UniProtKB/Swiss-Prot annotation:
It comes from Turnip yellow mosaic virus. Changing G865A: 70% loss of deubiquitinase activity. GO terms for biological process: DNA-templated transcription; methylation; mRNA modification; proteolysis; RNA processing; symbiont-mediated perturbation of host ubiquitin-like protein modification; viral RNA genome replication. The lineage of its organism: Viruses, Riboviria, Orthornavirae, Kitrinoviricota, Alsuviricetes. This is Non-structural replication polyprotein. A motif (GPP flap) lies at residues 865-867. ATP binds at G976, F977, A978, G979, C980, G981, K982, T983.
Amino acid sequence: MAFQLALDALAPTTHRDPSLHPILESTVDSIRSSIQTYPWSIPKELLPLLNSYGIPTSGLGTSHHPHAAHKTIETFLLCTHWSFQATTPSSVMFMKPSKFNKLAQVNSNFRELKNYRLHPNDSTRYPFTSPDLPVFPTIFMHDALMYYHPSQIMDLFLRKPNLERLYASLVVPPEAHLSDQSFYPKLYTYTTTRHTLHYVPEGHEAGSYNQPSDAHSWLRINSIRLGNHHLSVTILESWGPVHSLLIQRGTPPPDPSLQAPPTLMTSDLFRSYQEPRLDVVSFRIPDAIELPQATFLQQPLRDRLVPRAVYNALFTYTRAVRTLRTSDPAAFVRMHSSKPDHDWVTSNAWDNLQTFALLNVPLRPNVVYHVLQSPIASLSLYLRQHWRRLTATAVPILSFLTLLQRFLPLPIPLAEVKSITAFRRELYRKKEPHHPLDVFHLQHRVRNYHSAISAVRPASPPHQKLPHALQKAALLLLRPISPLLTATPFFRSEQKSMLPNAELSWTLKRFALPWQASLVLLALSESSILLHKLFSPPTLQAQHDTYHRHLHPGSYSLQWERTPLSIPRTTAFLPFTPTTSTAPPDRSEASLPPAFASTFVPRPPPAASSPGAQPPTTTAAPPTPIEPTQRTHQNSDLALESSTSTEPPPPPIRSPDMTPSAPVLFPEINSPRRFPPQLPATPDLEPAHTPPPLSIPHQDPTDSADPLMGSHLLHHSLPAPPTHPLPSSQLLPAPLTNDPTAIGPVLPFEELHPRRYPENTATFLTRLRSLPSNHLPQPTLNCLLSAVSDQTKVSEEHLWESLQTILPDSQLSNEETNTLGLSTEHLTALAHLYNFQATVYSDRGPILFGPSDTIKRIDITHTTGPPSHFSPGKRLLGSQPSAKGHPSDPLIRAMKSFKVSGNYLPFSEAHNHPTSISHAKNLISNMKNGFDGVLSLLDVSTGQRTGPTPKERIIQIDHYLDTNPGKTTPVVHFAGFAGCGKTYPIQQLLKTKLFKDFRVSCPTTELRTEWKTAMELHGSQSWRFNTWESSILKSSRILVIDEIYKMPRGYLDLSILADPALELVIILGDPLQGEYHSQSKDSSNHRLPSETLRLLPYIDMYCWWSYRIPQCIARLFQIHSFNAWQGVIGSVSTPHDQSPVLTNSHASSLTFNSLGYRSCTISSSQGLTFCDPAIIVLDNYTKWLSSANGLVALTRSRSGVQFMGPSSYVGGTNGSSAMFSDAFNNSLIIMDRYFPSLFPQLKLITSPLTTRGPKLNGATPSASPTHRSPNFHLPPHIPLSYDRDFVTVNPTLPDQGPETRLDTHFLPPSRLPLHFDLPPAITPPPVSTSVDPPQAKASPVYPGEFFDSLAAFFLPAHDPSTREILHKDQSSNQFPWFDRPFSLSCQPSSLISAKHAPNHDPTLLPASINKRLRFRPSDSPHQITADDVVLGLQLFHSLCRAYSRQPNSTVPFNPELFAECISLNEYAQLSSKTQSTIVANASRSDPDWRHTTVKIFAKAQHKVNDGSIFGSWKACQTLALMHDYVILVLGPVKKYQRIFDNADRPPNIYSHCGKTPNQLRDWCQEHLTHSTPKIANDYTAFDQSQHGESVVLEALKMKRLNIPSHLIQLHVHLKTNVSTQFGPLTCMRLTGEPGTYDDNTDYNLAVIYSQYDVGSCPIMVSGDDSLIDHPLPTRHDWPSVLKRLHLRFKLELTSHPLFCGYYVGPAGCIRNPLALFCKLMIAVDDDALDDRRLSYLTEFTTGHLLGESLWHLLPETHVQYQSACFDFFCRRCPRHEKMLLDDSTPALSLLERITSSPRWLTKNAMYLLPAKLRLAITSLSQTQSFPESIEVSHAESELLHYVQ
């Protein structure tokens, strides 16, 4: 802690780094070790979990794996956990040999490996099956325990008496007994079906496997007992689902504490030591609590487990808020349920949690805390709190006292009258009691009792039982009548008195109530207790305990008690009887490497000639293990495994039967289906006498047969095919194979000299050096040696001699080193020898060479040349500019739009293929050494050399790959069934102009010939068709690879890397028809993963049809064929002359060719098409044909197949071909059976692609109605904030960021259902706050012009009434002047132009109807004529030409983007008007209002421009008020189109939609030229002149984007059926319909491109305004278009063009000063200057900030008005507003003053403000809402980039 405080104190100083250096230095070794041991890229969410398990992984690995966390756990188990346990020689079971070799390198005590093939797929994992059991006393069982029953483990111990310990790894989720829900779903998931548990590691479905569902019972037992045999089971460690168990012989000794004598325990302190302890185990799970069960309900435990942190936070939240609504707990839970840490919680658990929290909110603990109280007050409080309990306790006690007299006789002193005398007479005497027969001698016993009492108390006689004090009290009471008592016996007087006298007797007499009364009292007391318990609440203590137990449950722990297991018998451990073996003698680690201790060799079968050879006899074997569907280690391949092996191994064999009765923990053994029948043993397998070492997996071809290979394997192997006929040029042998200085097989350098090399740097092929150095002369081109010598201080001679000790001479002195010099292969060898790592800085960036486990580092710079050169040291290079888009994008778009016979190409997208250097290096190395291909072996020494030889070219490419990293290239994959027509559409595509720069690569010369014939190119273009080798040496923009799967592995990567000019790759092929296999035994190409799996993600769709195969073949494959010929499937004895012959081998093919038949192998016929029936030759190799080759053979011919050869090969027996047998017998060929791992993953399409747009059904989801009370009424005037009508309030709590949706509670009930109210799924990017730095410009020089002087004489003297009109005898009112103030001139300035005020001019709208509206003759819908269709198509083609689009291409519909447009449209509709306005227009959503009806009203405005200044009456602009349904449904469509238009618009076309004046200025400066004149155009009645062609154009635009058809139909229906209050209208443009501006702009642009050949000429369009930079030639078809148009043009050739109120030119743009001058005059006279001044000032600054160049934009007549405006702002604006006239950064105080009152700031003014000011203003609440806010426009322009 003190050290951390010191570091914090040093943080701001320079002493922190030196202080941290020791810490960083200490972590280097651990990080390096972690990266080397665990090199995989682990998901970041799993890294903390692995670290909590104690696994030291750093998370910095880069290798990818489908289940990297499982590999990490497994590596830790083997290399760390098991390695420490293996202290003696041990055996390992169920592990790949390669993995075992690496494990043995970690710990040499791992001596032998035993593998058993218990499943057919185990043959891919285990090369051999061990015939015997392990021999060492310690065994490690790898990931197989879950498939074995304890009885089988007992059998293993009984069969191996020397076996003491069995370490086993078990993979089973410990929570499997709860449910199918995993506690760590990111790490693993599982499901349980019947008796099988299906385990999926890290979501890798392909790596899933099955195991018995009761495998978790291994975690519930602690011992196994069979008679006198005992095995103890110990759980050593658990890492999630992986557990390490130790099973050892015997039982553990008893706990010493249990032997302690009982006499030692004199207290309770150590009492538990005397009791036996439970064997409880627990497992790590997420921190959770268990919710209580609901009352009288049973809920699964898994649905009641919730995170403790969430529960505690929710508990506090529900009691901390002031107001809690019913939806608050659910909303709180919703915030946490989406967190990744809580993915283990079920949805039912979340539901139970929020319900539990809501229903238990009222509960509070009933406790009080009285500290400072007196004892009496505390006693009073105690009695008040506990009086019920005290009473209930006292009543039974009192009831019991009533019976005490009957069971315990206690005498009570009572006075009894014996006699009464008077007048000397005895009037009364008590009779003596009668003494009945004392049966039980009670009197005797009483006397004895009294005698005993008397003996103790002799002073108490039997009949004088009164105490002495009582006797004295009696004498005092009787003293007054003592004379009368003298005669009583008490006083010993016999004389009777005259006076009345009574004789009393005082005795101790027993008294008792009747027993019936006692029982009644007792029953009443017990009843009171019962009633108290039934009707009274629990006690305070019980309430307190229940509250805390109910609302504060403890943490849930996954634990249970382990118990012993007794088994009645054993079950065989193996399915065969193992042989006996003994342990090999122990040898030192230095003398003997780890190897298989008892690897067996299959016994060769007896010779056929031996007369005594008999078939081996078989014996019965014990039952097999419990059914293991798959083993765990086949899914989580360890780190010890090769990194290139990602395919999971096969599972062990499934056991169908079981034998009876077993313990309950493993019920599978009771099932008779679990164990298989008795299997025969394999007596022909015996152990080898001399185990070969594992470190030599390959043999020299000249050596004898591999001892690990049995002769029966050699017997079934294929014979070597005959050699091919040599080509015309001489072939040379591969130098590396025949190098006498090398020995052993050809292997990658990293395998011969294993170390941690950087990826793809040590994969070059070489051989071990066998001879010492031959002292070769040092090469002349030795710059690499010089660079290394300068860095390592080792001489060049020593470096060269060192290379001759590790590399063969053929790799040191050859044509490559003599011509191009040494390469990085030699650098890697030097780095390995001298233990350094080199960083080579090439043109493409730094690349590491040499081992990574060294500390020494050197730097080398490589320049590509020519010639290339290595130099010491590091060269600093500047960064390259980033690309602005891939050059293949136009090609891909063209492919998407290309059609052949009306069908699209069958693909969806181009996939970016990241090239693999390792794949390319592997192939080029094999080509360079002559293992694949023949180019490097061609001898061209006899011919005249005009350039580098093919081998030199290959070497150059190899060098290029060493210093250039990979790149990413688009790849389009066309895949389909044989004959589906993959080639023909591509051939037609390549004939187009855009794809003319291509080349085709084919696997065979036959296929290349077919391409040449089909393309029909000139002879000079024949170089474009190549075989796969020669294609690598050529260059083109587009590469087509036909039959990609017949190319060597890595060919795609090498083709891309070898051609820097390549932009697009098109690959054709069928993954079902097999792949390439090298014919050279030295080729390492087979080490690469299969291309079928690697290219599978690129297959967007698989064409499941055929144009080739006849109907008889199509029926076999259940596929549709367009070939109507029925075809034939039969057999022939001899081939026909014209029929092609397909053979299995090259030798047979050569034989048939020599006999005069056309023949080829089945494999080489792939891609060919035959017209005659194909003849398939059947021979002894037919049964070995793969399913892929069988498919190729059956699908070559258009007319069928005929088999020639013995019919036994198609008879369906074991010696026949299964697919050929099905075909010959007309049986269906099930593709899933022949291609089980590949065919199910193909996305089949059954017909050619006719459209690319998806089909959408439905529009809006139905919403649940809200039911209200029938007597629910609202007041007549409802305020917008009224909320008493809310039935419930459910506020949304978004997961990220604030709520962006606006409130909809105020919407009219009829409009609310029209809103989707969708939350935006895409967060818009933050608006850039950066401000462009101001550029220094010369301030403009203004001629002196006084604003007031110019304004005084600007307005001419005239009578305003002369400019008005009469409409139906009523004068208009567009020039009001009466009582209007004025100060600048003699009349109000508002008379400058007409003012449209519908409220003050009743004639405005009626008088404007005839000019603004066009009516239909009847109510019938508008009919789209043929001319409309033709003109619409012409305009659409012109519009596509403007956007460089293909008219026939379509864009797939993007539902996510459309949903965002819906949200954006609703946001604009709710924010563009105030809530009061929306409520006031509730009738717009009235259901009785037909959505085709439009209400027309006049727009209120005072428009001031050049056309209206000093003009007369002007018709108003009409607005169309449409139904809300139209706006909310079609509005998103227009915004959707706008996004794509903005993305596709060429830079030479400017659209002013959503643009600011500053953007207009920048575009003009970039694109407009100084050429004059420019063409400006405006139309007369543009909206009214659009007829049916506009509807056709708009429909075609929507169809291109694949807008749902019902929306297109709705748009057409509205346009052709619109009606108003004045009558039905034509399909004219209505201002107010969705997309008015966009559609007008597109129509205008289409007309321009129909009239002119635009080319790259800059064009500006905005609605009906347009500007062309210079005159253009007219198109030849313009007259045909013009005659159909209804437009009236207003063309103007001018040197000072006006566009959207701005004068534009190459200098920029400037606001029309005349219009601005008039607006200022009107603002002054209207006394509205304070509200409008800032807006006008910002418009003025656009041109003012241009500097002196602004004068080039204005006509001379407007210079005075520009100067007057400048004078006005200088005089009338305050200082803080004048800062807008300067480019300098404003001061903070001035900024605050400007943003203090922007209430009347207009939209244009907002656009013109600098970004800093605009951001400050928008943060203020009083800013008004614009009809189209800047945020909406920005979102529309940026949305496409975040969706696509």
